[in-house]
Amino acid sequence: MAFRQALQLAACGLAGGSAAVLFSAVAVGKPRGGGDADTRATEPPAWTGARAGRGVWDTNWDRREPLSLINLKKRNVESGEDELTSRLDHYKAKATRHIFLIRHSQYHVDGSLEKDRTLTPLGREQAELTGLRLASLGLKFNKIVHSSMTRAVETTDIISKHLPGVSRVSTDLLREGAPIEPDPPVSHWKPEAVQYYEDGARIEAAFRNYIHRADARQEEDSYEIFICHANVIRYIVCRALQFPPEGWLRLSLNNGSITHLVIRPNGRVALRTLGDTGFMPPDKITRS
């Protein structure tokens, strides 16, 4: 009976002029011009990690939140909370990590091969100034990790002279690339989709490998330098601050600039400086 009444009400509604409303509802989402709706995916690639929601900080963003590292199924029900507290303390970070992200200096952009894209004379001056600035901070730097690309290697060579005794490691993970399709898109830079697919996963791997809270065994604060590229740094900053990663191209970095991220033991992340070149004379600042 209820089903028959529903049919009668629907028939009355259509007869009364509600048909237009019904058809209008069906057409929602179709462009007025009659073409197909834009079906492009609006979600970022899976490797960027699922965001908890607008304005919600993911406390376990680096998968090192102590409680997430404990197998609660093995918890001893007799010792109860005391054992849980003890195990949590075992996994808790105690130290702060200071991450210094350095963009390489100006280089010859017209080199036909990557190995030919060496630093310009001005670029070498910029690297000297950056090295002097880092040395003047009076910090005990633990290590330098740098991209294996020529312009990053040469920048590292010069900066290292001002930081004697600091070990250095080369990695392909920090090489320049296209991390994720920027939003809004730009007309002057449009890599192939496969480049985002390949570079994006690699740069995300660099983020996961290098950007995280300190290991629980680390007793003292650390100061680490990463010398790489603008796209990589901008993407890392967005990911570390849990900003939409597709907004990376809205940031701008000068050559030889210093970006300082701080990762606290509780996983909180702060951006101390972004692209600082205030230590350079105005005529030495470039962004190529």
Swiss-Prot record:
What is the catalytic activity of this protein? O-phospho-L-seryl-[protein] + H2O = L-seryl-[protein] + phosphate; O-phospho-L-threonyl-[protein] + H2O = L-threonyl-[protein] + phosphate
The UniProt entry, under Pfam families, shows: His_Phos_1
What does the UniProt entry say about where the protein is found? Mitochondrion outer membrane; Mitochondrion inner membrane
Tell me the classification of the organism that encodes this protein.
Eukaryota, Metazoa, Chordata, Craniata, Vertebrata
Q: From what organism does this protein derive?
A: Mus musculus
Q: Which GO terms describe its biological process?
A: necroptotic process; negative regulation of cold-induced thermogenesis
Mention one GO molecular function. Answer: protein serine/threonine phosphatase activity
Q: Which residues carry this modification: Phosphoserine?
A: S79, S86
**Gene this chain is encoded by:** Pgam5
Recorded protein name is: Serine/threonine-protein phosphatase PGAM5, mitochondrial
The family database entries (SMART domains) matched by this protein are listed as: PGAM
